[in-house]
Swiss-Prot record:
Induction: By stress conditions e.g. heat shock.
InterPro entries: ATPase_NBD (IPR043129), Chaperone_DnaK (IPR012725), Heat_shock_70_CS (IPR018181), HSP70_C_sf (IPR029048), HSP70_peptide-bd_sf (IPR029047), Hsp_70_fam (IPR013126)
A Pfam family annotated for this UniProt entry: HSP70
Keywords attached to this entry: ATP-binding, Chaperone, Nucleotide-binding, Phosphoprotein, Stress response
Similarity field: Belongs to the heat shock protein 70 family.
Keyword ATP-binding recorded: yes
Comp. bias regions, Low complexity: 604-616
Region annotation Disordered: where it falls in the sequence: 603-627
Superkingdom, taxonomy of origin: Bacteria
This protein's name: Chaperone protein DnaK
Segments forming a coiled coil: none
């Protein structure tokens, strides 16, 4: 049986590790480096370059050199963040037939998972060269805040690369595995702050020692799928472009070649400013105009860089607050803070994390390699090579379906330990409804429109029945990879339909904010919308039951009473259309009052029938039975008052 390798598929860099002799080993690539740039280039002769060779030729082949493609996985072309990237990236981002954001190189459209597959293939080859045998299985990491379709796309990328993805695990969880394996026995709570090249995650994890077994339980996770080192680089690029325009009057944003050189220089400057207080960006012959060639030389101090990215660092703190709150722990309960991702080497980031958590972050974890190491440990667990380790991960966002009135009914709450399964019984909204559409959603908002749509499917051939009668059981099943399977079953017929949510689009930055951060801010708005839906549904149900009762027992009341009920029903129907909650509730109350006589008539008939049956059975006096009937009617009327 071959080895299961662990791969950290990063936005900027990737890394591969394997268990050897019970210990994780990070494998050097063919260039001798322990990490590989997540860069893929398509040469003119059809050759595909991956890693350092691709990065080296980027300046001369900017339009066909792809980087940071992980940020496009599962995203729609129309999304604001994708549109922003279109202006920033030297390569072409194109719209796929299904509306997804793809890339275009040499006149051919390519899906992001295909590009990621090239990087995975390089990681696979790196491991095979080291092990001297074929590798077919892997554990691949993803940002904890990746949604279902993004996880599915990552799994697809593995399949394209010729790998069977045995498990998808969250990057902070993998880092916790790498950190916690060699720690002394005993319980501890850790915070993993993961600021990588393109994404940010924070996870609160409890490491417990239970009968000699290491148990890693994720208590809560949060993050931002569009915040990372690439954004820090971009701030430097924007600053240089602005300064150069002031000095030379030339806008470098229109020059693809210049932008590619600037990107390399910005990344280098950022790294240098982590250890030095000042750096110089010097790019001779950066561009030319009618007056001749232009040279770029600009000094950037650490203080200036920090001021440029201050808001980006601040953006990472709010998810930390939410994660602590969701985990039910205080800052003082955190024993260790682990920093993961190359961007955490920036002194200002370390300072901000220290300020928030009130303690110095650990320095004994390699931020570039910890995630891959954790992935290989999980591979060892799956293979049986690593024993006494239990990993309990969570789903980052709530999952549910759209129900009557556009409400999201949650079946699985965020931060639920996976794998997990949940079922709930729903019914039809109309009489003789023969099919239901199950609309699957992911997010935290009360109303369906505020959440991410993951897909929908139909359950048809439901036998004709009054509304509310059919029983449709909807089951959500999240596997250990965090990937969702949904089924709907008609309990009467046993007919069932299933769906594995397919990757159709990702979560935009705006969508994530709407789902998680803004959930609290919009709580009042959501509550009002929910109350309106409840009022509508209750009023609608009352109209339906009154219509039915009037059809069956209308002959037992006077014409005036019947007219009053019909008028009240019409008013209630108009109120539902108005969308005014107070009006709906008032008209519902009026309809209930108008229907009182009808209710009394129905009740009186039932009591009379019941009394007659009792009299026949007992053979007693009719007077006594009549008295019983009168008493019962009197009691009911008294209650209604």
């Amino acid at each position: 049986m071959g080895k299961i390798i662990g791969i950290d598929l990063g936005t900027t860099n990737s890394c591969v590790s394997v268990m050897e002799g019970g210990k994780p080993k990070v494998i050097e690539n063919s260039e001798g480096a322990r990490t590989t740039p997540s860069v893929v280039a398509y040469a003119e002769d059809g050759e595909i370059l991956v890693g350092a060779p691709a990065k080296r030729q980027a300046v001369t082949n900017a339009r066909n050199t792809l980087f940071a493609v992980k940020r496009l996985i599962g995203r729609r072309f129309e999304e604001k963040e994708v549109q922003k990237d279109i202006d920033l990236m030297p390569y072409t981002i194109a719209k796929a037939d299904n509306g997804d954001a793809w890339v275009e190189v040499r006149g051919k459209k390519i899906a992001p998972p295909q590009v990621s597959a090239e990087v995975l293939r390089k990681m696979k080859k790196t491991a095979e060269d080291y092990l001297g045998e074929e590798v077919t299985e892997a554990v691949i990491t993803v940002p904890a805040y990746f949604n279902d379709s993004q996880r599915q796309a990552t799994k697809d990328a593995g399949r394209i690369a010729g790998l069977e993805v045995k498990r998808i695990i969250n990057e902070p969880t993998a880092a916790a595995l790498a950190f916690g394996m060699d720690k002394k026995p005993g319980d501890s709570k850790i915070a993993v702050y993961d600021l990588g090249g393109g994404t940010f995650d924070i996870s609160i994890i409890e490491i417990a020692d239970i009968d000699g077994e290491h148990q890693f339980e994720v208590l809560a996770t949060n993050g931002d799928t569009f915040l990372g080192g690439e954004d820090f680089d971009q701030r430097i690029i924007d600053y240089i472009v602005t300064e150069f325009k002031k000095e030379q009057g030339v806008d470098l944003k229109n020059d693809v070649l210049a932008l590619q050189r600037l990107k390399e220089a910005a990344e280098k400057a950022k790294i240098e400013l982590s250890s030095g207080s000042q750096t110089e960006v010097n790019l001779p012959y950066i561009t030319a105009d009618a007056t001749g060639p232009k040279h770029l030389a600009i000094k950037i101090t650490r203080a200036k860089f920090e001021s440029l990215v201050e808001d980006l660092i601040e953006r990472s703190i709010e998810p930390c607050r939410i994660a602590l709150k969701d985990a039910g722990v205080k800052v003082s309960d955190i024993d260790d803070v682990i920093l993961v991702g190359g961007q955490t080497r920036m002194p200002k980031v370390i300072e901000k994390v220290k300020e928030f958590f009130g303690k110095e972050p650990r320095r004994d974890v390699n931020p570039d390699e910890a995630v891959a190491v954790g992935a290989s440990i999980q591979g060892g667990v799956l293979q049986g090579e690593v024993k006494d380790v239990l990993l309990l991960d969570v789903t980052p966002l709530s999952l549910g379906i759209e129900t009557l009135g556009g409400v999201m009914t949650k079946l699985i709450q965020k931060n639920t330990t996976i794998p997990t399964k949940a079922s709930q019984v729903f019914s039809t909204a109309d009489d003789n409804q023969s099919a239901v559409t199950i609309h699957v959603l992911q997010g935290e908002r009360e109303m369906a429109s505020g959440n991410k749509s993951l897909g929908q499917f139909n359950l048809s051939d439901i036998p004709p029945a009054p509304r509310g009668m059919p029983q449709i059981e909807v089951t959500f099943d999240i596997d250990a990879n965090g990937i969702l399977h949904v089924s709907a079953k008609d309990k009467a017929t046993g007919k069932e339909n299933k769906i594995k949510i397919q990757a159709n689009s990702g979560l935009s930055d705006e969508e994530v904010e709407r789902m998680v951060r803004d959930a609290a801010a919009h709580a009042e708005e959501d509550k009002k919308a929910h109350e309106l839906v409840d009022a509508r549904n209750q009023c609608d149900a009352l109209i339906h039951s009154t219509k039915k009762a009037l059809a069956e027992h209308g002959d037992k009341i006077g014409a005036d009473d019947k007219a009053k009920i019909e008028a009240a029903m019409k008013d209630a129907e108009e109120a539902i259309k108005s969308g005014d909650k107070d009006s709906i509730e008032a008209k519902s109350q009026a309809l209930a009052m108008a229907s009182q006589k009808l209710g009394e008539a129905m009740y009186g008939q039932q009591q009379a029938e019941g009394g007659a049956q009792a009299a026949g059975a007992a053979g007693g006096s009719s007077k006594a039975d009549d008295a019983d009937v009168v008493d019962a009617e009197f009691t009911e009327v008294k209650d209604k008052k």
